[in-house]
Amino acid sequence: MARYTGPRDKVSRRFGVALFGSTKALEKRPFPPGQHGMRAGRKKKSDYGVMLAEKQKLRFQYGVLEGQFRKYYAEAARRRGITGDILLQLLELRLDNVVYRLGFSNTRAGARQLVSHGHITVNGKKTNIASYSCRPGDVIAVGGKASSQQLVTRFLDLTQATVVPDWLECDRDKLTGKIARVPSKEEIAPIVNEQLIVEFYSR
């Protein structure tokens, strides 16, 4: 399955929540897109439909393909602890998401491009894999090229009001960040019910 590149507001309207940051689309049209959107919004979903929607919301939020998402769930289920919480942590520690959380980009899609185009380093080494799993102690930095630094500096102007979460350390002047620790579920503040995703895969 290819990565979704269509209108993001339509996806947010489909699920009734802003998946990609604030949007006025939900205020103007608080119902699913399409010819029968208003009627579809009033339909009661089956239990399966509710669980599927939660999975899709989380997948779209982080820009993860279906196959990748299944692998994240399998890894979360394999580890000791609360599966839903671990799933959220695995997604949150993706390199593209960390770049986004640091404010080096104003969207996850933009952060993914920064990584894939070689603008980001991890512990001093260029890393162009958006799904790279960061660990506590990892130092994330913008590459030394002037073009990389100018690009991220422009993004920082757009994200000045962004609050960097406590599990990250950020030096905006040096364009660097560090993973201080693994984030808690409360810090991630998911917009989904992750337990329903666990139930979806446990059927």
Curated annotation (Swiss-Prot):
One of its GO terms (molecular function) is rRNA binding. SUPFAM superfamilies: Alpha-L RNA-binding motif. PROSITE patterns: RIBOSOMAL_S4, S4. The keyword rRNA-binding applies. Residues 93-158 form the S4 RNA-binding domain. InterPro entries: Ribosomal_uS4 (IPR022801), Ribosomal_uS4_bac-type (IPR005709), Ribosomal_uS4_CS (IPR018079), Ribosomal_uS4_N (IPR001912), S4_RNA-bd (IPR002942), S4_RNA-bd_sf (IPR036986). One of its GO terms (cellular component) is small ribosomal subunit. GO terms for biological process: ribosomal small subunit biogenesis; translation. Keywords: Ribonucleoprotein, Ribosomal protein, RNA-binding, rRNA-binding. Belongs to the universal ribosomal protein uS4 family. One of the primary rRNA binding proteins, it binds directly to 16S rRNA where it nucleates assembly of the body of the 30S subunit. With S5 and S12 plays an important role in translational accuracy. Part of the 30S ribosomal subunit. Contacts protein S5. The interaction surface between S4 and S5 is involved in control of translational fidelity. This is Small ribosomal subunit protein uS4. The lineage of its organism: Bacteria, Pseudomonadati, Verrucomicrobiota, Verrucomicrobiia, Verrucomicrobiales. The gene is rpsD.
